[in-house]
Structures are given as C-alpha cells and as structure tokens.
Amino acid sequence: MPKLRTTSDQFFKAKIFNQNITFVNLSNQPTYVQSRVLRLKSKEPETIDWIESIPVTDTLFDVGANIGIYTISAGARGIKTYAFEPHSGNFNILCQNISANNFPCTAYCIAFSNKSAFDIMGVKNYHPGVADNTINKNKEYNHGVVVHDLDSLVEVNALPQPHHIKIDIDGHEDKFYQGAKKTIGKCKSVLFEIETQYEYIVDELKNQGFKIIGKHKRNENEHNFIFSK
C-alpha cells in the first residue's frame, strides 16, 4: 500500500515499489491525487500487479495516461515509459509529475485513432484529473486535438515498438485499435479497458496469439482485460 506524506502545498510524496514518488497537488481538487495514490492497490490492483510483472528492461506505452498515476508508478520501477494524454489540463499536470521525479518517462500531447488529422475532443471540463474525454463527441466543452494512428508512427520510427501497452481511452477503443493493430500484435502483453460494445477486440487479440490472463469488471459496461503472449 502506498504511503503518503505532504511536503508542501504544491507537492506531496508517496512510496510505491520501495521508491519515493512526488506528485503535484491539484488546487481545484486538493485530495484527488492523494486519494488516487492511496487507493492504487484497491482501485485497480490488477494494474499495479501487471506493472510489477513487467521486466525493468522493457518499454511501456501508457495510452490515456491522465495525470500520470500509472506512468509514474511504472517509472518508479525503472521501466522506460511513454505517456500519451490529449486533455490539456491533464497533460499539464502529467508533465509536472514527470518533471518532479527522476524516472525514465516521456509525455506526448496526442490522441491515437485510425487516421492522421486535426480533430475535436469533447471534455467534461478543463480541470486536471478529469476522465471520460472523447474524440468527436459532444460534451459541454471542446478543444482541438491532434490525432494519429499509432502503427504509422511506429513504422517510421517516430516511436519505438513497445513491449507492453496500457490502454484506457473512454469509449475510443474501436478507432484506436483499428490504427494500432500491428503495434499491439507485436507486444508481449496488453492491458486494455474495453467497453462491452467493443469486445470484438478481445477475439481479434486472441487471433493475434494473445491469451486472457485477467478480466476485471470496472463497471456494468467495461472491463479491464489483461492479455499476454
């Protein structure tokens, strides 16, 4: 269980995997990050266990990184981690969290899809930590976003081929998968939060040689699937 201690109004420190980690406090939600860190093992224990199973010499992609709770956790183990987060407020805090820790993590403000384009992302609000942001769907607020298919970026070596990939993208699973099939197929393991309407992806991953080693209910409409080869 992570241990927490506040060091200032701006930052607080915790401990995970026997490493000290630092996070930025959110002024609009002063207990949000603290509660997320303290609930790491209870909220998504399968995610922490999966991160703990990754060899430290491997590379991880965290797609839909939010403010970097799991990015930093992976970095604390020495795993080279690439974090992708298109929400402007989340990306700002994600970068600050990476900067506050001397871990091998890099962040990119990009959304992955099945095409290369400028698009619109619907967001609940602009507060850091917000989730359930969706590409090209109406929300109360919107902002522009650069989208790209992951396969093309890996093929031209703009990004490395990851060994492992974590995907949490709030209803955008279909278009993401269509643009990332080749890259995913070459991974050792995948943690994919999938809504029920997109569970065809499970069968496709099985056809690529993956086995389901974990299935964890997140709510009535989505599960965390863990796949391995």
Regions from the PLM with identified roles:
Residues 1-152, 155-157, 201-229:
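S-adenosyl-L-methionine
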Residues 18, 27, 114, 123-125, ...:
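Non-catalytic surface loops within mature trypsin-like serine protease
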Residues 59-69, 142-199:
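Active-site segment flanking the S-adenosylmethionine/decSAM binding pocket
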Residues 86, 110, 195:
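Cofactor-binding loop segments of dinucleotide-utilizing enzymes, especially the Rossmann-like FAD-
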Residues 88-91, 116, 173-174, 198:
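A structural helix-start
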Residues 117, 174, 219-223:
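Conserved catalytic loop of SAM-dependent methyltransferase domains
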Residues 118-120, 177, 202-203:
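Short, well-ordered secondary-structure micro-motifs
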